[in-house]
From Swiss-Prot:
GO terms for biological process, alphabetical: DNA recombination; DNA repair
Source species of the chain: Aromatoleum aromaticum (strain DSM 19018 / LMG 30748 / EbN1) (Azoarcus sp. (strain EbN1))
Start and end residues of each stretch annotated as Domain III: 152-199
Protein name: Holliday junction branch migration complex subunit RuvA
Pfam families named in the record: HHH_5, RuvA_C, RuvA_N
Gene designation per UniProt: ruvA
Free-text note on domains in this protein's UniProt record: Has three domains with a flexible linker between the domains II and III and assumes an 'L' shape. Domain III is highly mobile and contacts RuvB.
Function: The RuvA-RuvB-RuvC complex processes Holliday junction (HJ) DNA during genetic recombination and DNA repair, while the RuvA-RuvB complex plays an important role in the rescue of blocked DNA replication forks via replication fork reversal (RFR). RuvA specifically binds to HJ cruciform DNA, conferring on it an open structure. The RuvB hexamer acts as an ATP-dependent pump, pulling dsDNA into and through the RuvAB complex. HJ branch migration allows RuvC to scan DNA until it finds its consensus sequence, where it cleaves and resolves the cruciform DNA.
Gene Ontology MF terms in the entry: ATP binding; four-way junction DNA binding; four-way junction helicase activity
Length: 199
């Protein structure tokens, strides 16, 4: 199991990044919450990782904190929740917001996330109840130092990130129009997610 990766950030194409470690480029899918805090390409970073081995390949997922990875692993244990949906949940909610939603059994926050319907939200909350807190003994700690988000004037990155999260092209384009042109990619994705969650 690959539990941690430290290297140079080569590419950022949300939700996937490429990290070079001793000459090997690892493709890693990350939630938008982690993507927001990535350094600029060419700079070093360290991520907590989860390796999934399936018949169609090996897939690596990266997280800024151990808590985020623990939440991801708990989400994967919920019936009907795959890695893509788990990443969407962590892109739409912080770990603390997810824990709060689980504690209060709030389906409202979850159904705003692409790929999560009411029944899935109810099942997720039910199955995670009493589990999430135990899975996060160091809740709120263990964040990897990684640097602040860097500005990037690529509207296509914002659009691609929204499409990768499951939003339709129409929804993504609509949110994109409401964001000022000079907005950086990380801030743009964050603003778009807020706009879409209110829709």
């Amino acid at each position: 199991m690959i539990g941690r990766i430290t290297g140079i950030l080569l590419e950022k194409n949300p939700p996937q990044i490429v990290v070079d470690t001793h000459g090997v480029g690892y493709e890693i899918d990350v939630p938008m919450s982690t993507f927001y805090g990535l350094p600029a390409t060419g700079e070093s970073l360290s991520l907590f990782t989860h390796l999934a081995i399936r018949e169609d390949g090996h897939f690596l997922y990266g997280f800024a904190s151990a808590d985020e990875r623990a939440a991801f692993r708990q989400l994967l244990k919920v019936s009907g929740i795959g890695a893509r949906t788990a990443l969407s949940v962590l892109s739409g909610l912080s770990v603390s917001d997810l824990a709060q939603a689980v504690a209060l059994q709030e389906t409202g926050r979850l159904v705003k996330i692409p790929g999560i319907g009411k029944k899935t939200a109810e099942r997720l909350l039910l199955e995670l109840r009493d589990k999430l807190g135990r899975a996060l003994p160091g809740f709120g700690a263990s964040t990897v130092p990684g640097a602040a988000a860097q500005p990037a004037d690529s509207r296509s990155d914002i659009l691609n990130a929204l499409l990768a999260l499951g939003y339709s092209d129409k929804e993504a384009q609509s949110a994109l129009k409401a964001i000022p042109p000079e907005t950086g990619v990380s801030d743009g994705i964050r603003q778009a997610l807020k706009l879409l969650s209110k829709a």
